[in-house]
Swiss-Prot record:
Name the UniProt record assigns to this protein: ATP phosphoribosyltransferase regulatory subunit
Organism: Staphylococcus aureus (strain bovine RF122 / ET3-1)
InterPro entries with a match to the protein in the record: aa-tRNA-synth_II/BPL/LPL, HisRS-like_core, HisZ
Family: Belongs to the class-II aminoacyl-tRNA synthetase family. HisZ subfamily.
Additional record remark: This function is generally fulfilled by the C-terminal part of HisG, which is missing in some bacteria such as this one.
Length: 272
């Protein structure tokens, strides 16, 4: 496929995504890639993000290039509430001076059934339009870390070692028998079963993970991995997250996660 054909295919995929989810009764939204920001309303995390964003000042006003759709929509709907419970979008994101086209969905005040239906529809779109299918799924939950590791041990060094799966370092700091070490020693496909030995069966994170595992099995997905190493990109990501990896295009990943800040939601996004 030459450059012109790739460009046409990309634009067709964007349009097809909007048509597909318009037909499924999602509200289509189109926001400017340039965000107008108010310094007084930016929190510590917003300021930290500026390292990967292009921003400038003009006549006492700050402008920044969009780097995250969920974040932009959350900020906008916090100021201008919407009655929509499910929205679909396409457009550019720019991170660290690299541009990409993203398509995605947001479920507001989400129920489990609505989120799972959104994921099901998203995968069907990928199968039909992008001619690809889910190869394996990664599940995780941002409450697991607190369930497995005492707050006093959640130092930058230890968190970094967990993220890097540095078992030798973790053994030194935590001990061989520590739950995190024991879980990370297992194959990621087995870790969800092993997790049950280290946190109560009624822990909300474990309950939610098992519900999703069972649902994914009913959808025909058996290759499911647990990730206990991921740390939330923003503090409002407090619950379950999912990554669907694909068979044909290994670099393409459908990602999703629950968040609760000024708005509660569950977002799903795919970079084309």
């Amino acid at each position: 496929m030459n450059n012109s054909e790739q460009l046409i295919a990309l634009k067709e995929s964007e349009t097809a995504f909007l048509k597909y989810f318009n037909k499924a009764d999602y509200e289509l939204v189109d926001f400017s890639v340039v965000e107008k920001l108010d310094w007084k309303q930016l929190n510590h995390e917003d300021l930290q993000q500026m390292g990967e964003r292009n921003f400038w000042q003009h006549e006492h006003q700050i402008y920044a290039i969009r780097n995250d759709f969920t974040d932009q929509l959350l900020r906008y709907y916090s100021m201008y509430p919407t009655a929509a419970t499910k929205v679909a979008y396409t457009g550019l994101i720019i991170r660290n001076n690299e541009a990409a086209v993203q398509v995605g969905l947001e479920n507001y005040a989400p129920s489990l059934a609505n989120v799972q239906q959104s994921l099901k529809l998203f995968i069907q779109f990928i199968q039909q339009q992008l001619r690809d299918n889910v190869y394996f799924v990664v599940l995780g939950h941002y409450q697991l870390l607190d369930a497995l590791l005492d707050k006093s041990l959640q130092t930058p060094d230890i968190l970094s070692m967990i993220e890097e799966r540095n078992l030798s370092g973790l053994v030194t700091y935590l001990s061989t028998e520590h739950p995190i070490v024991q879980i990370l020693k297992e194959n990621t496909q087995q870790q969800l079963n092993v997790l049950e030995h280290y946190i109560p069966n009624d822990h909300p994170a474990l309950v939610e993970l098992k519900i999703w595992e069972r649902w994914l099995h009913t959808q025909g997905y058996k290759d499911i991995h647990l990730d206990i190493t991921a740390q939330p990109p923003r503090s409002y990501y407090t619950g379950l997250f999912i990554q669907c990896h694909f068979a044909e295009n290994e670099s393409r990943v459908l990602t999703g996660g629950y968040y609760k800040g000024s708005i509660e939601g569950f977002g799903l996004g795919l970079t084309l």
